[in-house]
């Protein structure tokens, strides 16, 4: 009888241990870096002021800030396969759902040698969001974000507005 009770107790303890381990959230992180590139366009320059880059994982814990240098990037300097590192960091393992660009106010476009302000209506407040939905591996995860300047710029009566068209290359 004692042997049967001992055996059943061991089975119960094992089952409880397995269920606790299976339900425990992983605290592991994986490395990620974001690169930026652009398609060719006829503008002289398209300068975008990047303040911050954030990612959202599938764990619903909100946005994770990446290491981002506050910088202004001429998108046209990164065409035909050229890229620039704009952010990197460690994020919780899992599936990367979204990337968010947070832009500053120093955005402009140069057309025919003349600099014009580039309006970015929501990008300075809520940021530009890109849906990704990519499972991240334990090794370095590099995502190339293609910011299409030609399709993103809208001109009306001499005013230029940024309506971003950003794709990522899986």
Where are each of the predicted segments found?
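C-terminal motif of bacterial Sec signal peptides marking the signal peptidase cleavage site
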Residues: 18-22
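Bacterial N-terminal signal peptides that target proteins for export
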Residues: 1-10
């Amino acid at each position: 009888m004692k042997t049967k009770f001992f055996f059943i107790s061991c089975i119960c303890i094992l089952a409880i241990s397995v269920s606790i381990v299976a339900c425990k959230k992983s605290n592991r992180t994986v490395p990620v870096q974001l690169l930026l590139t652009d398609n060719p366009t006829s503008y002289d320059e398209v300068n975008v002021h990047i303040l911050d880059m954030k990612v959202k994982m599938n764990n619903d814990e909100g946005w994770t800030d990446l290491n981002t240098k506050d910088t202004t990037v001429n998108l046209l300097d990164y065409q035909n396969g050229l890229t620039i590192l704009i952010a990197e960091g460690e994020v919780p393992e899992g599936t990367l759902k979204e990337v968010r660009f947070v832009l500053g106010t120093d955005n402009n476009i140069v057309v025919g040698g003349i600099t014009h302000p580039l309006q970015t209506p929501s990008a300075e407040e809520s940021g530009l969001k890109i849906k990704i939905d990519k499972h991240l591996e334990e090794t370095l995860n590099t995502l190339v974000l293609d910011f299409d300047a030609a399709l993103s710029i809208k001109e009306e009566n001499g005013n230029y507005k940024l309506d971003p068209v950003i794709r990522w290359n899986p």
